[in-house]
A protein has these predicted regions:
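Conserved acidic donor-binding segment of nucleotide-sugar-dependent glycosyltransferases
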Residues: 306-307, 311-318, 327-333
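An aromatic- and histidine-rich active-site surface loop
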Residues: 13, 75-79, 93-113, 277
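Nucleotide-activated donor-binding/catalytic signature segment of Leloir-type glycosyltransferases, i.e.
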Residues: 236-260
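A charged, aromatic-enriched C-terminal amphipathic alpha-helix characteristic of glycosyltransferases
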Residues: 333-365
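Membrane-proximal helix-turn-helix segments that form the acceptor-binding/catalytic region
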Residues: 83-87, 110-112, 132-149
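Conserved donor-binding/catalytic core segment of Leloir-type glycosyltransferases
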Residues: 185-203, 209-212, 225-226
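Donor nucleotide-sugar binding/catalytic pocket of nucleotide-sugar-dependent glycosyltransferases
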Residues: 144-181
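Acidic donor-binding loop of glycosyltransferase active sites
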Residues: 261-277, 290
Length: 367
């Protein structure tokens, strides 16, 4: 078997943890998972250790970066040590999802351009992302220097091909994220909406809260809104909640084993984002066959269809979101079966694991 070296930033473990096991059927993999000491622990550490125990040809290297400031001399030295370890293996290719400082400028002294693949999670950096200016700077540098890339949406594929001409690019969507079977079910007579995932400004949870308050004042029918995800500034959103009885809040990192029951309680999911390149949360929604109300953005429109398996609104449009939520509440019994059936058809046709993994293998084998 040939060897791959795989380098994953902590924030992208939830993507790679689903693809690595399938690639192990073809390659030996040296997997470096990198996180910073400001985290108490790596969220997926238990799951990663279980994978390493299950597969003999997977060698897991969990790396905690200790430097407190990324622009310090210590951070540069620490990153050089990491890059030296990564390149110590004889490998067919290096695949990396890290595109920031000091990793990118230092990597040119260690990586070979011809056999390094970067995962471009955001060719277009979404509005509201923290450190967006520096992210654009170092990502742009990487995309001009290196040759090989993966994108996770068709719109990002086209953007990369037109912006950075002459690059080798392949598109493979996220593998649907299955965390197990739910043991819960929706509450009888209560239409329940779910927003799931890390709460960030560009995801516009304030829009969801305000729209929910509007719906509360417009109907006497029972409904509930579940908001589940880690947030560092929840006080900025809490202030919009006037009727806490319609909200179920889980403002924390949601352990993987609790995710199925979150979706088991919901009927619909809501993603009113201002901007997005692609969404891991949507992959979980599709996996659990929960129709979405979501923003009219290219990354969403290439996957779902309005009035067929989803309902679209203008990005972060509070009035339209309230209208769609109210429509779902008032017409749930008549619209829901067709929405779910169409969503399950989309899941079968577009997200076969075998087809997705073949895209990775075909690209890697051409290098």
């Amino acid at each position: 078997m040939e060897t791959l070296v795989w380098v994953t930033a902590e924030s992208f473990v939830e993507t790679d943890i689903h693809i690595i096991p399938m690639l192990l059927e073809r390659y030996n993999i040296e997997w470096y998972v990198v996180y910073y000491r400001r985290k108490e622990k790596l969220i997926y550490e238990t799951e990663l250790q279980k994978l390493a125990e299950r597969y003999q040809n997977l060698h897991l290297h969990i790396t905690c970066l200790m430097a407190s400031k990324i622009y310090s001399i210590e951070a540069i030295k620490e990153m050089c040590r990491l890059l030296k370890r990564v390149t110590s293996h004889r490998s067919k290719a290096v695949y990396s999802s890290i595109l920031n400082y000091p990793y990118i400028p230092l990597s040119i002294f260690y990586y070979k351009r011809k056999n390094t693949i970067f995962a471009a999670h955001n060719v277009h950096v979404p509005k509201g992302v923290s450190h967006s200016v520096s992210t654009k700077l170092y990502q742009g540098f990487a995309m001009r220097w290196y040759k090989n890339y993966q994108t996770f949406s068709k719109s990002q594929y086209e953007l990369l091909k037109t912006t950075y001409k002459g690059k080798n690019v392949f598109y493979a969507p996220f593998v649907l994220k299955d965390y197990g079977e739910p043991t819960t079910s929706p509450e009888d007579g209560v239409v329940t909406f779910l927003n799931f995932g890390r709460i960030r400004g560009y995801k516009c949870i304030d829009t969801l809260i305000r729209s929910s308050e509007t719906v509360y004042n417009a109907t006497k029918k029972k409904f509930k809104v579940i908001i589940a995800g880690e947030c560092s500034n929840w006080q900025d959103y809490q202030k919009y909640i006037k009727h806490p009885e319609i909200f179920e809040l889980h403002i924390e990192n949601i352990p993987n084993e609790q995710i199925p029951d979150m979706f088991g309680k919901a009927l619909y999911t809501v993603l009113p984002y201002q901007d997005i390149a692609q969404s891991g949360a949507l992959m979980v929604c599709i996996n659990y066959s929960k129709p979405s109300i979501l923003s009219k953005l290219p990354a969403f429109e290439e996957v779902l269809s309005d009035d067929e398996n989803a309902y679209f609104i203008e990005p972060a449009n509070e009035e339209q979101l309230a209208e769609r939520m109210l429509y779902c509440i008032n017409h749930h019994d008549e619209i829901y079966p067709a929405l779910v059936a169409n969503l399950e058809k989309t899941k079968e046709e577009q997200f076969s694991k075998e087809v997705i993994v073949k895209k990775y293998i075909d690209f890697i084998d051409r290098i």
